[in-house]
Regions:
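N-terminal membrane topogenic signal
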Residues: 1-19, 68-69
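Juxtamembrane "helix-exit" motif on the non-cytosolic side of transmembrane helices
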Residues: 26-36
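Transmembrane-helix motifs of polytopic, lipid-linked glycan transferases
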Residues: 49-65
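Transmembrane-helix signature of polytopic, membrane-embedded enzymes
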Residues: 62-81
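Membrane-interface transmembrane helices that cradle and orient dolichyl/undecaprenyl
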Residues: 66, 104-119
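Aromatic- and kink-enriched transmembrane "portal" helix at the membrane-lumen/periplasm boundary
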Residues: 76-95
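Membrane-interface alpha helices of multi-pass inner-membrane proteins
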Residues: 122-136
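Perimembrane helix-loop-helix junctions
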Residues: 141-153
Length: 153
């Protein structure tokens, strides 16, 4: 039944995912903060925007590179993993690091066109470096980048 519902990608699915993740986010951050000043609300808003951008960026990468067919399973798996591990929303550094790693993956997947390779390598390594500034363990994402340099070049 779930497979039949998400078999074809529809805008309704993404609205459903968006609402579910926003509710989970506010439930997670609503219990953590006791401050309701402007700057804490602004910080939470930026974290939410970065989190939702990483969701839509992952869906964009998957659909643009034809990693799955025209369905909503990638967004379903992303949301399912977030719902299974809601503590991943508690650290804002990981959320921003994830966003920059996703931007790096976008450039790594675009290497198959073999145009402007140096620019794409630089761009991907720049995004991983920025992700590493937020979360140190993101430096391990240089390994797939190095593997792609060896295999594509």
């Amino acid at each position: 039944m779930i497979t039949r519902f998400f078999r074809i990608s529809k805008p309704f699915h993404y609205i459903l995912f968006l609402l579910g993740l926003i509710l989970l986010f506010f439930f997670q951050y609503g219990h953590q903060t006791g401050q309701d000043d402007f700057f804490s609300l602004l910080k939470q808003g930026l974290i939410l925007i970065a989190f939702l951008l990483s969701l839509f960026l992952s869906v964009f990468i998957i659909t643009k590179n034809n990693l799955t067919e025209n369905n909503s399973f990638a967004a379903l798996y992303f949301c399912g993993l977030i719902f299974l591990t809601p503590q991943s929303l508690s650290d804002w550094e990981i959320i921003f690091s994830n966003l920059f790693v996703m931007l790096s993956f976008r450039r790594v997947f675009s290497l198959k066109t073999k145009q402007n390779l140096k620019k794409k390598y630089f761009d991907a390594s720049l995004w991983v470096t920025i992700a590493t500034l937020f979360y140190v363990w993101s430096a391990f994402y240089f390994i797939p980048l190095l593997v792609s340099i060896v295999t594509v070049s």
